[in-house]
Swiss-Prot record:
Keywords: Methylation, Ribonucleoprotein, Ribosomal protein, RNA-binding, rRNA-binding. One or more lysine residues are methylated. It comes from the Bacteria. InterPro entries: Ribosomal_uL11, Ribosomal_uL11_bac-typ, Ribosomal_uL11_C, Ribosomal_uL11_C_sf, Ribosomal_uL11_CS, Ribosomal_uL11_N, Ribosomal_uL11_N_sf. This is Large ribosomal subunit protein uL11. SUPFAM superfamilies: Ribosomal L11/L12e N-terminal domain, Ribosomal protein L11, C-terminal domain. Forms part of the ribosomal stalk which helps the ribosome interact with GTP-bound translation factors. The gene is rplK. It comes from Bacillus licheniformis (strain ATCC 14580 / DSM 13 / JCM 2505 / CCUG 7422 / NBRC 12200 / NCIMB 9375 / NCTC 10341 / NRRL NRS-1264 / Gibson 46).
Length: 141
C-alpha cells in the first residue's frame, strides 16, 4: 500500500544553502521531518545551481519520511541574473531598470518550460516577458 501524504511544505531556498535555521527548520520541524537529512539531500541535489533560489515541494508521509521535488528558479530571479540587477523597479511603468535581449528571454523560457503551463516556447516567452515588464525590464530584439 502506498504511504499516505500528511503534509506538503513549499519553500524557496537558495541552492546549496539549506540549513536548519529559519525558514527551513521551523517549517520542517512542525511536520516532524529529519531537518538535517533534508538539508544534506537538498544541498547535494542543488550544488550545481549556486546563486539561484530554488522552489522545493516537500511531501511528508505519516511515517515521518519525506520526498521532495525541486522546481526551476522563479522567472524573476533568472531575469535579474540576466539583466545583472539586484532588484526590479519600484515603479515599473515609469522607471525602467534594465534591458534584456529577446534571445536571453527565450533561454529563460526554455529553462522554465517544465514548470510553466505553456503549450510551446513562444507562450512561455510571453509569460517571461510579462514578468520582465512588471519588474521594469525592457525587452529588446
Amino acid at each position: 500500500m502506498a504511504k499516505k501524504v500528511v503534509k506538503v511544505v513549499k519553500l524557496q531556498i537558495p541552492a546549496g544553502k539549506a540549513n536548519p535555521a529559519p525558514p527551513v527548520g521551523p517549517a520542517l520541524g512542525q511536520a516532524g521531518v529529519n531537518i538535517m537529512g533534508f538539508c544534506k539531500e537538498f544541498n547535494a541535489r542543488t550544488s550545481d545551481q549556486a546563486g539561484l533560489i530554488i522552489p522545493v515541494e516537500i511531501s511528508v508521509y505519516e511515517d515521518r519520511s519525506f520526498t521532495f521535488i525541486t522546481k526551476t528558479p522563479p522567472a524573476a530571479v533568472l531575469l535579474k541574473k540576466a539583466a545583472g540587477i539586484e532588484s526590479g523597479s519600484g515603479e515599473p511603468n515609469r522607471n525602467k531598470v534594465a534591458t534584456v535581449k529577446r534571445d536571453k528571454v527565450r533561454e529563460i523560457a526554455e529553462t522554465k518550460m517544465p514548470d510553466l503551463n505553456a503549450a510551446d516556447v513562444e507562450a512561455a516567452m510571453r509569460m517571461v516577458e510579462g514578468t520582465a515588464r512588471s519588474m521594469g525590464i525592457v525587452i529588446e530584439d
